Amino acid sequence: MRVVKTVVLTMLLAGGLAAVPVARAATAPGVAVAPQYDTTHVYVAPADFGKFVASLTATFGGTTTKQRVFTVTPTPSETLSQLVLTPVGSLSVFGFKTPIPHPFGTERTGYLVTDLDAAIRAARANGADVIVAPFPDPIGRDAVIQWPGGVNMQLYWHTKAPNYGQLQTVPENRVYVSPDRAADFTRRFIAFAHGKIVSDNPRAPGVEIGRPSDTYRRIRIESGFGKVTVLVTDGHLPYPYGHEMTGYEVTDLADTLAKAKAAGVAVITEPYSVDGRQATIVQFPGGYIAEIHASAHRR
C-alpha cells in the first residue's frame, strides 16, 4: 500500500508520535506482496513437531506442505521444516536437529518481498539494522533485520513466486515495545511498509496485557504486509503476556477453543471481552503461545 509521505506524517502527529525525519526510502516503491505471505516463525523440538502441526490444523483448519529437512541458515545447521497455511494465518515451523545458529529463533515473522535487495535498502534507510546479511536458502534468499526496540523480522524472496490462497482473516503481528522506542519503531516501520495507523489508543484496557486495573498504549498498523499491533508497556507483564507473537482472528472464539482443547491446546488466560473483541491466550503442544480473538459483535 503506497501512502504519500505527508499523509503518513499527519497521521503520526495525530497519533502523538514525534516528528523526527525518516529517510527518503518512504517514497520508494513498496516491496510487500500480501498478508498471506507474512509467516509467523515457530521453533519447536523435533519430538513435538508433528503434534504441534496437527494441533494447528485441528484448531484453525488449513493445509500443510510436506515435512522436509533443510539448511535454512547461512552457517551449517539442519532443521525439520514445514509450512502451515490456515485461513487465519501462515506459519513456518522449524524443528532444529542441530544447535540453532545465532540469531535464528529470535525473528518473529517472515515477510515475503518483491525484491530482497530493494527491501534491505529500504529497511536500512528507515533505521533497521541488518543483523543477518542476505544469504541463499533452498528456495530463494533471506535476511534478518532488527527495528528500534529490538524487533527482529526475516525478509525473504522466492526464486519461484509462491501462490498461497487469500486469508479469511488477517492475523496481527503483536509487538511489545517500551515507551522509549514506540514512536521510533512505529514511524520507521510505517515508512518502510508504506503502512498507516488505523488506531492509537493511549488508554487501552489493561486486561489486554493481563493488568485489568491499568491502561496502556496500543497502536494498530495496517500495510501490504498485514497487521501489526504495537503494545507499549513498562515491561511489568504477567505471564504469558509478551510471549505471544501473533494474534489470530476467528469467527467464533468458543468453537475455536473447543477444537483447540480437543487437540491438546491449553487455554492459559481467562477469555475476556473488551472494545468489541473477545480474546484469550493459548499454548500449543511444543510450547508455542498465541492470542486468539473474535469480534464480540459476531453471532
What are the residue ranges of the model-derived segments?
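Positively charged n-region of N-terminal signal peptides that target proteins for export
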Residues: 1-6
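Bacterial N-terminal signal peptides
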Residues: 7-19
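Sec/Tat signal peptide C-region and signal peptidase I cleavage site
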Residues: 19-25
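Core segments of cupin and vicinal oxygen chelate
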Residues: 31-34, 41-88, 125, 133-148, ...
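Vicinal oxygen chelate
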Residues: 35-47, 82-84, 96-122, 141-146, ...
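Catalytic cores of nucleotide-enabled group-transfer and carboxylate-activating enzymes in metabolic
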Residues: 91-96, 128-131
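Short, structured interface segments
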Residues: 143-164
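Short beta->alpha transition motifs characteristic of CBS
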Residues: 156-161, 292-299
